[in-house]
Amino acid sequence: MKITLWGIVIVGWGCAYSAALADPAWRSVEKILGRPGTEQAGGFRIDFPRTDLNVTIEGIPLEPALAFTSRFYFKPLVKGTLLAGEVVLLDQEERQVTAQLKANGFQVSQVHGFQMDESPRIKTLHIVGRGSRVNLAMALNRVLSAAPLKEETSEKPQKTTVVLTSATEAPAAGKTKASSPEGDWERVEAILGPGKVEGKVLLYEDPFERNISEKGLEIPAWMGMETILRFQKVPGVLGQKNGFWNFFKMGKKPEKIAAVAGQLLLTPVRAEAVEETLAANQVKVAFRYDLESSPRMVILYVGGLGPEEALAEGFKRVLDQIRLDQK
């Protein structure tokens, strides 16, 4: 399925866009939405974790940071501002939220499920809109408040950029390993390189090393145009009554278990091979986007549950395949 995520909102607005403003004045957006965001190079991003949800897979609790956070990106154009985003919601919230989005001038470009046998069932709506930043923020606030889909906070997020090391290289010398009260990530980081710990989640971001645009508008990595992986440790060991494979019967010692979710950005020519590698490593593809971008790109939304080291090894092979088009 080919989907235009960006071009539909810039028709008649021109394909040029403004450079990063010296003073974007995003404070008004934060005030309207009741939550701090993060200024980006040429725009602004604000997140709303669904902390009101208790999502589980086979009884295992999952963190909002793993895959259940609504994210919105504001990008100034020559005239007005482009807003793109992802709204995380429950099945039963979809009708009301969709109606609110349309009533407030947003377009829903796509809807897909998490599809990991999670309870309750989760969906993601991809949206776009245009207008002034203040009007967009006010419209978005009406949508989020109607469900309600947001919690206000005064905590200011830290600006951090975490990039995956090359899948063919060992972690750089001198890099600090991620540590967390929930346990270390040494096994995963030995394979994928140092990551950033956000609570119980280990985050990796890997921008595509080529400019990506649609209808003349460059889409930066911070607007979601990158590979993103999040790992979360889960309680229990293989062989218990939570649906894991019974390694004890095979004489193998218990392994550390993790849930993983994220998105892979790649060229269409690599998609089939990557999907085969994912399937071989018990990672599901929840949804596939075929973008009408230049160059043509595909986004695979993925999720898996299993031994953390095996998952990391599988994603290392996937990253090797993806990076063939970046050399």
Model-derived features: where do they sit?
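Positively charged n-region of N-terminal signal peptides that target proteins for export
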Residues: 1-5
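Bacterial N-terminal signal peptides
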Residues: 6-16
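Boundary at the C-terminal end of the N-terminal hydrophobic targeting segment
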Residues: 16-22
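Intrinsic disorder/low-complexity detector
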Residues: 23-57, 63, 145-214, 245-248, ...
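Intrinsic, low-complexity N-terminal interaction/targeting segments
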Residues: 57-76, 108-113, 208-237
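Extended intrinsically disordered, low-complexity coil regions enriched in Ser, Thr, Gly, Ala
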Residues: 63-66, 90-116, 220-223, 268-293
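Structural motif
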Residues: 73-84, 232-239, 251-261, 324-325
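Hydrophobic, ordered structural segments
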Residues: 91-108, 119-174, 280, 298-326
